[in-house]
Design a protein with these regions (language model features):
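Short, small/polar-rich loop/turn modules that mediate ligand/substrate recognition or access, typified
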Residues: 145-149, 228-230
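Residue(s) in the substrate-gating loop at a strand-loop-helix junction
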Residues: 113
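Substrate-binding pocket helix/loop in short-chain dehydrogenase/reductase
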Residues: 67-69, 73-79, 198
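Short C-terminal tail/terminal secondary-structure segment
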Residues: 63-66, 217-218, 229-245
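Active-site helix of classical SDR
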Residues: 92, 129, 137
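Active-site loop-to-helix junction immediately N-terminal to the catalytic Tyr of the SDR YXXXK motif
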Residues: 72, 119-127, 139
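The beta1-alpha1 cofactor-binding region of Rossmann-like NAD(H)/NADP(H)-dependent oxidoreductases
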Residues: 30-41, 74, 211-212
Length: 245
C-alpha cells in the first residue's frame, strides 16, 4: 500500500503551502479512478511535488463475480467497466494534458489480464472489461503518439499479495476446484494452495507474483523497450489457453 511504501522509503520534505506532506522517494495520494476531477487533482499534486511526471502505470481494477444463477446486476457491470476500462481512459486523457505541457516523452502502462482472451464461466463482466482494456492499449498508443508510448501488462491470476483474494474468496475458490483444506488452516497456507493450483495449469508451473508483474512494468517504462508501443506483455507463466490465434 501507499502507507507501507512511504513508511519504508520516507516522504522527504513537503511543498510549502501546497497541502502535500511529502515529495521524497514516494508519496501516497488518494483518487477515484472513475472521477475525472479526482484524477486531475491527483496528477496536479504529483506534478507539483516532483516537477512533472514521466511514466504512469494504472493498476486499479475490480472483479465482481456473477451470482449463483450466473447473473450480474447492471450497477456491478457498470462499476466493473467504470474502473477497468473508463478509469484507465480518464487517467490517460488527463495525463496526456500534462505530458503535452511538459513537451517531454512519456510512458503509460495499463493492466489488463490473461482473461481478456480466455472466455470462461463466472467472470463475464471482468473478462469483457479486460478485453476492452486490451484494445484500449492499442487505441491510446495511436491517439497519444508520438509523444507517449502506451502498452499493457496482462498477468494471469495473482493470488499471493493480491487484495482481490481475501480469505473468503480463497476458500470459495478452493471449494470450487475441490482442493482439500481445513476451516482452521492459516490464510497463508490456503493462498499457497490456490496459487499453486493456478500455477499447475501453466507451462512453467510457477505462481505469478506481484514482483513478476513489476519486472514487466519496469521494462515498459524504461528505455529498454523504447521502440515498443501498442503491445500487451503477458505475465502468465505460459497459459496456453491464452495463446493468441
Amino acid at each position: 500500500t501507499a502507507d507501507e511504501i512511504t513508511a519504508k522509503l520516507g516522504q522527504g520534505i513537503g511543498v510549502a503551502g501546497s497541502g502535500i506532506s511529502g515529495c521524497g522517494p514516494s508519496i501516497g495520494l488518494a483518487a477515484n479512478i472513475t472521477d475525472r476531477a479526482s484524477i486531475r487533482v491527483m496528477l496536479d499534486q504529483v506534478a507539483l511535488a516532483y516537477g512533472g511526471f514521466d511514466s504512469i502505470a494504472v493498476t486499479a481494477g475490480i472483479f465482481v463475480p456473477s451470482d449463483t444463477t450466473g447473473h450480474i446486476p447492471d450497477d456491478k457491470w457498470a462499476l466493473t467497466f467504470g474502473i477497468n476500462v473508463t478509469g484507465s481512459y480518464l487517467v490517460a486523457d488527463e495525463a496526456f494534458k500534462t505530458w503535452k505541457e511538459q513537451g517531454l516523452r512519456g510512458n503509460l502502462v495499463l493492466t489488463t489480464s490473461a482473461n481478456a482472451v480466455v472466455a470462461k464461466k463466472g467472470s463475464v463482466a471482468y473478462d469483457c472489461s479486460k478485453a476492452a482494456a486490451n484494445h484500449l492499449v492499442r487505441e491510446l498508443s495511436i491517439e497519444l503518439s508520438p509523444l507517449v508510448r502506451v502498452n499493457g501488462v496482462a498477468p494471469a491470476t495473482v493470488v499471493q499479495g493480491s487484495a482481490m483474494f481475501p480469505r473468503d474468496r480463497v476458500i470459495g475458490s478452493l471449494a470450487k476446484y475441490s482442493i482439500p483444506y481445513t476451516d482452521d488452516e492459516a490464510t497463508e497456507s490456503l493462498v499457497k494452495k490456490l496459487a499453486q493450483f493456478y500455477a499447475d495449469r501453466t507451462l512453467t508451473k510457477s505462481p505469478i507474483t506481484p514482483a513478476d508483474q513489476a519486472e514487466a512494468y519496469f521494462l515498459l517504462v524504461t528505455n529498454r523497450l523504447s521502440k515498443t508501443t501498442g503491445q500487451v506483455i503477458t505475465v502468465d507463466g505460459g497459459l496456453h489457453e491464452a495463446f493468441l490465434r
